[in-house]
């Protein structure tokens, strides 16, 4: 994109389509300025400014949801495609960043660590994810993805005095570099093949999704293109935590700060699915003969591995990480079905929103029960929670029930919509595996609920009370947790216009 293209975009007022992303960047810079201006004892206001600013940007996206740019795939010289799915993901990522910021107020205070940089990185990473969901070009896709990834490298190792956090950061860095290498190598192969003048339909812009799709449709059996697609798919599989690229999840989820773990579990995973949804219905389409069996095998292995591995976990952060692997498998079913069933796109979006509500509620409870070293959170620590803090116990029960897919909660409806789409697409074997996965997941989710409601905490004989002291629930956190739980119930009982709109996408 050269200077003339920038001027052309300005003349068409295309920059106004990026107001939310630009506003997030400006808000991130504002936080740094406020840090220099405010006295140190007033730095607590910075978190409030960040949260209020994000609510303002969310309000703008909601007000401008039916943007005049919707449907265009040539914005910024073809880098961006504004769509309703992209708008929905904008809302998703803003909600995620708001809840992460609220969690950070609770969690970071225990470690006595700088907070301004945390909010700054979250804002920049959120802007990158919003661009990623609207990418129509591999250049923007890769730049946005790496901007997100670099921010996550820092956030994962944010507890610089914790060996587990530093270890998690190093593991995530190594695995992230590997996945980026696979992804970039795949993009290079596609770029080289589609720009080859000796092949039919070669294009001058082989990294544009639309141009690349047209080329691949004319060359549906090119070996190098097939290899490139598999490598790109492998790079994305790392982000969503799909088998066999989920190996980093348990250790990284345990060692990272709780707000960062929530950010990884929800936002980063959703960003991967957002771009995968675009690619499956564009670039990967002509090679569906290859992509479908790969995704089907990946979905089956992801569901079974995630659920079976979670059965043996006692650390709740590792448990929620491995259960998130199984949810990636369920979402892959929706992605596969979306190639032939249009309503599957809405089913995936609804599942993601239901997953957001339940997962952030669980992490909100975890943040209040964790001590200074929040990597050591065991199921035993939740024993007697219903008696000691009925509010947190109720939130936890609703959230885990939704993740397990228990009616009438939003998680149940999300799974139901995805399963219906898979049934319409004829993937009956996948449905059978998914049902087995749901049954297995009920065991460990309800084991967690059982500990909170039906067990009593008994300190071990070799320690007075190794269980960390619980943090009182503040007003902002209490409202956020109650909202998450109530919305999980509401969207399970009544989807209304929102559900109808999502399923019409």
UniProtKB/Swiss-Prot annotation:
Pfam families in UniProt: Proton_antipo_M
Nucleus as UniProt keyword: no
Topological category with respect to the lipid bilayer: Multi-pass membrane protein
GO molecular function: NADH dehydrogenase (ubiquinone) activity; NADH:ubiquinone reductase (non-electrogenic) activity; quinone binding
EC number: 7.1.1.-
GO BP annotations, alphabetical order: ATP synthesis coupled electron transport
Catalytic reaction(s) noted: a quinone + NADH + 5 H(+)(in) = a quinol + NAD(+) + 4 H(+)(out)
Record's subcellular location: Cell inner membrane
GO CC annotation terms, alphabetical: plasma membrane
Catalytic EC class: translocase
TM region(s), chain numbering: 18-38, 45-65, 84-104, 116-136, 138-158, 173-193, 223-243, 271-291, 292-312, 319-339, 345-365, 391-411, 429-449, 473-493
Alphabetized UniProt keyword annotations: Cell inner membrane, Cell membrane, Membrane, NAD, Quinone, Translocase, Transmembrane, Transmembrane helix, Transport, Ubiquinone
Free-text function comment from the UniProt entry: NDH-1 shuttles electrons from NADH, via FMN and iron-sulfur (Fe-S) centers, to quinones in the respiratory chain. The immediate electron acceptor for the enzyme in this species is believed to be ubiquinone. Couples the redox reaction to proton translocation (for every two electrons transferred, four hydrogen ions are translocated across the cytoplasmic membrane), and thus conserves the redox energy in a proton gradient.
Self-association state and partner proteins as the record states: NDH-1 is composed of 14 different subunits. Subunits NuoA, H, J, K, L, M, N constitute the membrane sector of the complex.
Family: Belongs to the complex I subunit 2 family.
NCBIfam families found in the cross-reference section: NDH_I_N
Designated name of the protein: NADH-quinone oxidoreductase subunit N 1
Organism of origin: Opitutus terrae (strain DSM 11246 / JCM 15787 / PB90-1)
């Amino acid at each position: 994109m050269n200077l003339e293209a920038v001027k052309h975009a300005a003349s068409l007022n295309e920059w106004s389509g990026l107001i939310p992303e630009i506003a997030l960047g400006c808000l991130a810079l504002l936080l740094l300025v406020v840090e220099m201006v405010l006295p140190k004892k007033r730095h607590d206001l910075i978190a409030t400014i960040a949260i209020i600013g994000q609510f303002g940007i969310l309000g703008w996206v909601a007000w401008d949801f039916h943007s005049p740019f919707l449907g265009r795939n040539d914005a910024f010289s073809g880098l961006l495609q504004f769509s309703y799915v992209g708008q929905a993901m904008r809302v998703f990522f803003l909600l995620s960043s708001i809840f992460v910021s609220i969690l950070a107020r609770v969690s970071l205070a225990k470690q006595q660590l700088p907070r301004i940089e945390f909010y700054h990185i979250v804002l920049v990473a959120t802007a990158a994810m919003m661009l990623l969901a609207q990418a129509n070009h591999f250049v923007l896709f890769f730049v946005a993805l790496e901007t997100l990834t670099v921010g996550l490298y820092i956030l994962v190792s944010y507890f610089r005095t914790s060996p587990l956090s530093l270890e998690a950061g190093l593991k995530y860095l190594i695995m992230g570099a590997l996945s980026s290498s696979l992804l970039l190598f795949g993009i290079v192969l596609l770029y080289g093949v589609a720009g080859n003048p000796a092949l039919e339909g070669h294009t001058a812009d082989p990294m544009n999704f639309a141009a690349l799709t047209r080329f691949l449709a004319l060359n549906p059996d090119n070996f190098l293109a097939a290899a490139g697609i598999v490598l790109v798919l492998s790079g994305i599989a790392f982000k969503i935590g799909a088998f066999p690229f989920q190996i980093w999840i348990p250790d990284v989820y345990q060692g990272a700060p709780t707000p960062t773990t929530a950010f990884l579990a929800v936002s980063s995973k959703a960003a991967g699915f957002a771009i995968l949804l675009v690619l499956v219905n564009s670039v990967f389409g002509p090679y569906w003969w290859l992509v479908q069996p790969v995704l089907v095998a990946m979905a089956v292995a992801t569901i079974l591995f995630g659920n079976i591995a979670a059965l043996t976990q006692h650390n709740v952060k590792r448990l929620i990480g491995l259960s998130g692997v199984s949810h990636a498998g369920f979402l892959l079913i929706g992605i596969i079905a979306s190639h032939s069933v249009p309503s599957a796109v809405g089913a995936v979006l609804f599942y993601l929103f239901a997953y957001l509500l339940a997962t952030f509620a669980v992490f909100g409870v975890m943040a209040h029960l964790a001590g200074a070293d929040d990597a050591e959170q065991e199921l035993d620590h939740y024993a007697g929670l219903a008696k000691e803090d009925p509010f947190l116990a109720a939130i936890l029960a609703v959230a885990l029930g939704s993740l397990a897919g228990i009616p009438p909660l939003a998680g149940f409806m999300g799974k139901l919509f995805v399963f219906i789409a898979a049934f319409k697409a004829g993937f009956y074997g996948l449905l059978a595996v998914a049902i087995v996965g749901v049954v297995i997941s009920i065991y460990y989710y309800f084991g967690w609920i059982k500990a909170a409601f039906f067990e009593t905490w008994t300190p071990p004989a070799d320690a007075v009370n190794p269980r960390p002291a619980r943090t009182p629930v503040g007003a902002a956190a209490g409202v956020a947790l109650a909202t998450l739980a109530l919305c999980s119930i509401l969207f399970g009982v009544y989807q209304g216009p929102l559900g109808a709109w999502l399923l019409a996408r």
